Design a protein with these regions (language model features):
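Extracellular modular ligand-binding repeats in secreted and cell-surface proteins
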Residues: 1-281
């Protein structure tokens, strides 16, 4: 009596039995079949007759075959198994259920907003795309089968395979090094996590200065943030100081009430004031 693994084509074991001509065999395949089932097999056909009678042919053996195959179990997020637990309860040291990542994966996006020292200046942005599939687990070997009958390919939850572009938030008094994080398209289950950092630097100021000893104390003017672009500032209003004329770094006269757009929003700009010539009466 041969026990054959139809999945691999190999013979698992062979039992030899004998008896006198015309006698009934007491041999049964049920015990072996039950044991194989405990190890993840399922019965295909039992070719051994229930009431075998030994024949009278001494030259030719009576051969019978029991066919078994590996039991296959579909696994997916809606019908999961406990990862690491024995597939066959009666075989604690045997094959184990696979990790959930074999059929359930999430790709994450994280965007952090920090200053030059790493201090958080705005709420972190997070997003994720989930992918699931159905795999088939071989109950005999623990092999994870990802194609063929009973399996389903990776699909994105809700059909979403994109991280949308993320506009950097405006942080008062600072400018960002990136206006936005670009969109990431065509994500799949094997895509790497996306980790981005946007760094903010404090904006500069207009700094009034004069060599005139009578020049009054004039406060600096911090560059205003551009409300529509975290990387930019808008022109800063030049302080009007009665009796003095303002000049930009290139020496150009700045008219009272005018504004100045700095070339580098993170650098201070010195506005030089010269005393107006007093006219006699």
């Amino acid at each position: 009596v041969s026990y054959v693994d139809d999945t691999t084509g190999k013979t698992l074991k062979t039992d030899s039995i004998s008896g006198t001509t015309g006698s009934k065999s007491s041999y049964s395949t049920s015990g072996n079949i039950a044991d194989y089932k405990k190890h993840g097999y399922e019965l295909v056909t039992d070719g051994y007759p229930a009431d075998l009678t030994f024949d009278n042919n001494d030259t030719t053996d009576q051969n019978f075959t029991v066919h078994l195959k590996h039991q296959l179990t579909p696994v997916n997020p809606t019908d999961p198994q406990t990862p690491g637990a024995p597939i066959n309860p009666d075989e604690p040291d045997g094959p184990k259920w696979p990790a959930r990542t074999n059929y359930d994966k999430t790709v994450n996006e994280t965007v952090s907003y920090v200053d030059q020292t790493g201090h958080v200046v705005a709420k972190q942005h997070t997003d994720s795309v989930n992918f699931t599939r159905t795999v088939v687990v071989d109950n005999v070997t623990g092999e994870v089968i990802t194609s063929g009958a009973g399996t389903k390919a990776w699909t994105a939850t809700n059909g979403d395979t994109t991280f949308d572009a993320v506009v950097s938030p405006v942080v008062s008094g600072s400018v960002a090094n990136k206006a936005q994080i670009a969109a990431v398209t065509d994500l799949n289950a094997d895509s790497a996590n996306v980790t981005e950092t946007v760094t903010y630097t404090k904006v500069g100021s207009l700094v009034p200065s004069s060599s005139d000893g009578n020049f009054p104390r004039v406060p600096t003017v911090v560059y205003p943030n551009d409300p529509s672009d975290a990387t930019k500032v808008t022109p800063a209003g030049v302080p009007t100081v009665p009796g003095y004329t303002a000049h930009d770094p290139e020496g150009h006269v700045l008219t009272p009430g005018s504004s100045y757009q700095p070339s580098d929003p993170t650098k201070d700009t010195t506005i030089t004031y010269t005393a107006d010539t007093q006219k006699g009466s």
